[in-house]
Swiss-Prot record:
Protein name: Calmodulin-alpha
Stated family: Belongs to the calmodulin family.
Chain residues that bind Ca(2+) 4: 130, 132, 134, 136, 141
Protein task: Calmodulin mediates the control of a large number of enzymes, ion channels and other proteins by Ca(2+). Among the enzymes to be stimulated by the calmodulin-Ca(2+) complex are a number of protein kinases and phosphatases.
GO molecular function, one term: calcium ion binding
Naturally occurring in which organism (per UniProt): Arbacia punctulata (Punctuate sea urchin)
Chain positions with N-acetylalanine modification: 2
Length: 142
């Protein structure tokens, strides 16, 4: 996971990590974790912090070393990216911005992508994703 980070990102994380590793022993306490992440533009909730710490802090001693920290940050960034990518993709389909993808909007985008679909195929795609049966696809269904 951490191998997907650029050298620049790793250097950035190392710098931030060092700022909070007061005694220079290569570990930070769980209390410092939130401060470190916020300094890097992340905005974790208390619950997220606790979950991350529980996942990373294998021995439960309340400290995290740099390799553990890198793994955690890589995971956090990946989650953020994919959520944002899904949102952007939804906006591409939701032409009128009303929060729903209609059959007409789906047909329009698929045609622009070079996919000539029959009305039946479009309706079938909508039906497969349309959990609440309103004939459209909302963000959650998407």
């Amino acid at each position: 996971m951490a191998d997907q980070l650029t050298e620049e990102q790793i250097a950035e994380f190392k710098e931030a990590f060092s700022l909070f590793d007061k005694d220079g022993d290569g570990t930070i306490t769980t209390k410092e974790l939130g401060t470190v992440m916020r300094s890097l533009g992340q905005n974790p909730t208390e619950a997220e912090l606790q979950d991350m710490i529980n996942e990373v802090d294998a021995d439960g001693n309340g400290t995290i070393d740099f390799p553990e920290f890198l793994t955690m940050m890589a995971r956090k960034m990946k989650d953020t990216d994919s959520e944002e990518e899904i949102r952007e993709a939804f906006r591409v389909f939701d032409k009128d911005g009303n929060g729903y993808i209609s059959a007409a909007e789906l047909r329009h985008v698929m045609t622009n992508l070079g996919e000539k679909l029959t009305d039946e195929e479009v309706d079938e795609m909508i039906r497969e994703a349309d959990i609440d049966g309103d004939g459209q696809v909302n963000y959650e269904e998407f």
